[in-house]
A protein has these predicted regions:
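Non-cysteine beta-strand/loop elements that form the S-adenosyl-L-methionine
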Residues: 93-95, 207, 363-369
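Metal-dependent amide/peptide-bond hydrolase catalytic core
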Residues: 232-408
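Divalent metal-coordination and catalytic microenvironments
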Residues: 42, 81, 94, 124, ...
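Acidic/His- and Gly-rich active-site-bordering loop/insert found
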Residues: 20-120, 125, 129-132, 136-145
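Short, small-residue-biased leader/transition segments that mark boundaries at the very start
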Residues: 1-4
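Intrinsic-disorder-associated, low-complexity terminal segments enriched in Asp/Asn/His/Tyr and depleted
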Residues: 8-14
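Histidine/acidic-residue-rich, glycine-tolerant segments that coordinate divalent metal ions
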Residues: 79, 101-103, 109-119, 126, ...
Length: 408
């Protein structure tokens, strides 16, 4: 399980000392079957965000077999497990999320979801299984701990406001020096690790707008205030916010995903409704887009005698990796001979960002796609699956991080 890295003589007391280097990949590989077993159980019994009662109990049951302090519930139904070392090393936290999605699974696999209309279609079952595997390995080597290891199992990542802020408010990062997390990613092949310093994921904001006009007969538009035409005008004008008012080297997205109005060919409705999303990596841009949308609506209201309701919900914070923690992720991957790549900026959101607002740390992606096994479906898709052989790579990455952080 280990190999001797160095052997030298300590001339002060004339003894030969050995520095030991663990083969974390070998240890993680030995835990592979166990992690797969954990993941397959979780995959069969998915639960929606903020409703994860059975999942919570299952995780607590696994942790209660280990020598760690378990704190629960943290927030609504989060779990914090702490392994305490004897030395002066830091306290490093790892986080896994465990909620599922309202998706009907279409995979024909022995571990298919048994909960109708609910599926682990984003890999959170894998995240939880990996961290439980890492916790078991840490438990087996707890006598060597120079610092403390905290495992944070988080509910409700998929739906705003997200579970992370509630868990932070309830003290899950108390005494934690640094935090790391991963997301299994089917778009990247197994055996790869992706990350980047600074911004990596966006803030996923949501908005909804109702334009209130005055309905009437389709043949007598002069007697109406047509909300459909005004909504169309707003949607087209809003396209200029990103293209004409934002520095082209900065990233932003404004997308309308839903428009609803009317129910008949010859009736102009009273109102029109739309919903959409705004994605940015920077809160100044986020505020700029919101303000510009509101000004457009104000102008249309004055010009057309309409009223409107503009509801803008700020999503998770943009996810920004801390430089030094990113370097640790990169070095760990290179030391473990994993294929490390610098990630592209991603317009998706992830509430791990809230942990990084209050503690240094880094988030990385672990490739779990495998074309040979036909595991290529995107996240949130009814055919989504993960290459379970990716678990040992993520687990060895976490263990190597503990070594580099002087905890193990």
């Amino acid at each position: 399980e280990m190999c001797i890295r160095d052997r030298y003589t300590n001339y002060h007391n004339n003894t030969e000392e050995v520095i030991v280097l663990f083969d974390w990949f070998q240890l993680a590989s030995k835990k592979e079957k166990r992690m797969i077993q954990l993941r397959r159980y979780l995959h069969q019994y998915p639960e929606l965000s903020f409703e994860e009662k059975q999942t919570h109990d299952y995780i607590v049951n696994q942790l209660s077999q280990l020598s760690c302090d378990i704190q629960t519930p943290v927030g609504r139904n989060g779990i914090k497990a702490t392994f305490k070392g004897k030395g002066e090393g830091p306290t490093i936290a790892f986080r896994a999320d465990f909620d599922a999605l309202p998706v009907q699974e279409l995979n024909d696999v022995p571990y298919k979801s048994k909960n109708d209309g609910c599926m682990h279609a984003c890999g959170h079952d894998g995240h939880t299984a990996i961290l439980l595997g890492v916790a078991e390995i840490v438990n087996e080597h707890r006598h060597l701990l120079k610092g403390n290891v905290v495992f944070i199992f988080q509910y409700g990542e998929e739906i705003m406001p997200g579970g992370s802020q509630e868990m932070i408010n309830d003290g899950c990062l108390q005494d934690v020096d640094k935090i790391y997390g991963t997301h299994l990613w089917s778009g990247y092949p197994t055996g790869t690790i992706y990350s980047r310093p600074g911004p990596i994921m966006a803030s996923p904001d949501e908005f909804s707008i109702t334009i209130q006009g005055r309905g009437g007969h389709g043949a007598k538009p002069q007697e109406t205030i047509d909300p459909i035409v005004i909504m169309a005008e707003f949607i087209l004008s809003a396209q200029k916010i990103v293209s004409r008012t934002i520095d082209p080297v900065k990233q932003a997205v404004l997308t309308f995903g839903m428009v609803q109005a009317g129910s008949s060919d010859s009736v102009i409705p009273d109102s029109a409704f739309c919903k959409g999303t705004v994605r940015t990596f920077d809160t100044n841009l986020q505020n700029h887009i919101k303000t510009k949308m509101d000004k457009l609506l104000q102008g249309l209201a004055v010009a057309n005698d309409i009223t409107y309701d503009f509801n803008y919900i700020k999503g998770y914070l943009p996810l920004h990796n801390h430089q030094q923690a990113y370097e640790v992720v990169k070095q760990a991957a290179n030391d473990m001979h994993l294929r490390f790549n610098e990630s592209d900026l991603m317009m998706i959101g992830e509430d791990f960002s809230h942990y990084l607002k209050v503690r240094p740390g880094a988030f990385f992606l672990t490739g779990c796609g495998n074309q040979d096994k036909n595991i290529t479906a995107p996240h949130h898709n009814p055919y989504f699956d993960i290459d379970e052989s990716s678990f040992k790579y993520a687990a060895s990455e976490f263990l190597k991080i503990l070594e580099l952080e002087n905890v193990l």
